[in-house]
């Protein structure tokens, strides 16, 4: 097995283990938000401390379960640039960069032409808690955010929020997408591709339990359906990118799309600082996801990449992006 394949397999094995042991709480590490010393809030989705961009796609899973006070990461050299050092004996986390580079190819007649090739490169990052900067982590993050705010101006501040998200914040995000949301059938939530609308059970029908509010359930489910809504050709264009031939109910392709939607919902909740809770039918998909990932580990990369593309489309619809940090 190639070195990159081993690293991918290690990440997939970790996620499979979480799915098998934590069941519908397997994505919990990136839910909610973190308060900075200056009382600002940031989402719990990991980000690079130098670029201040969130790790996205497969990298979310590379850092999954690494529970630290602040989700700030950087490479060994980046921490040195920040005036710190990685503590002796610390083990880093592998994250990857997928890119393309120019090359020259030859056609069947021997004529050279310009082309590109794809590559996947892994590198190691550490959390700020693993460094000599740990004691002033919150202050350093807040300072970096303030510097970015002064450079961008208030209207372009994509990096922080001054309070936890309100229902009005979440509703504004949904409204800006332009998706048609109806509340015709209580107790049922679904996206109808042929008519291009989402049906949601009314907010007042959602009951809280185990410390999770009905509002948490409602918006987590709505974000799941919004990810389904993005799959059309004019949005995130996922209609032809399903790795399975069949996409009917109960098929492998259907389960894959559900995995994309759940990952996308988790990303959206995380970026908005909202608590992610599972779909009511989440458990029925877990077994099929585990089996699919064991059979083909690369599916997690495909699903996370498509979920990230879907989230970025939702972000592109926003008139006011002040409630989330910039993504790569």
Positions of predicted regions on the chain:
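N-terminal accessory/interface modules of nucleic-acid-binding and processing proteins
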Residues: 1-328
């Amino acid at each position: 097995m190639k070195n990159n394949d081993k690293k991918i397999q290690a990440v997939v094995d970790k996620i499979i283990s979480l799915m098998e042991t934590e069941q519908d709480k397997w994505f919990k590490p990136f839910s909610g938000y973190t308060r900075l010393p200056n009382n600002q809030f940031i989402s719990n989705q990991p980000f690079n401390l130098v670029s201040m961009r969130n790790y996205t796609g497969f990298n979310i899973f590379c850092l999954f379960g690494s529970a630290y006070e602040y989700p700030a990461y950087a490479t060994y050299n980046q921490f040195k640039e920040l005036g710190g050092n990685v503590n002796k004996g610390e083990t880093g986390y592998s994250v990857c960069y997928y890119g393309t580079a120019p090359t020259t190819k030859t056609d069947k007649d021997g004529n050279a032409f310009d082309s590109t090739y794809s590559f996947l490169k892994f590198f190691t990052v550490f959390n700020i808690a693993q460094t000599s900067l740990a004691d002033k982590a919150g202050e350093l993050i807040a300072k970096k955010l303030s510097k970015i705010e002064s450079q961008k101006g208030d209207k372009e501040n994509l990096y922080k929020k001054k309070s936890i998200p309100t229902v009005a914040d979440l509703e504004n995000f949904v409204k800006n997408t332009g998706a048609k949301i109806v509340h015709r059938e209580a107790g049922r939530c679904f996206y109808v591709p042929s008519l291009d609308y989402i049906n949601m059970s009314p907010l007042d029908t959602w009951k809280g339990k185990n410390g999770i509010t009905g509002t948490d359930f409602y918006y987590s489910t709505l974000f799941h359906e919004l990810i389904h809504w993005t799959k059309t050709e004019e949005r995130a264009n996922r209609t032809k990118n399903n790795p399975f031939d069949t996409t009917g109910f109960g098929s492998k392709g259907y389960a894959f799309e559900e995995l994309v939607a759940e990952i996308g919902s988790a990303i959206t909740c995380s970026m908005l600082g909202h608590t992610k809770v599972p779909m009511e039918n989440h458990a029925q998909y877990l077994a099929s996801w585990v089996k699919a990932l064991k059979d083909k580990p690369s599916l997690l990369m495909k699903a996370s990449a498509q979920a990230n593309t879907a989230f970025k489309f939702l972000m592109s619809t926003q008139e006011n992006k002040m409630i989330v940090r910039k993504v790569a």
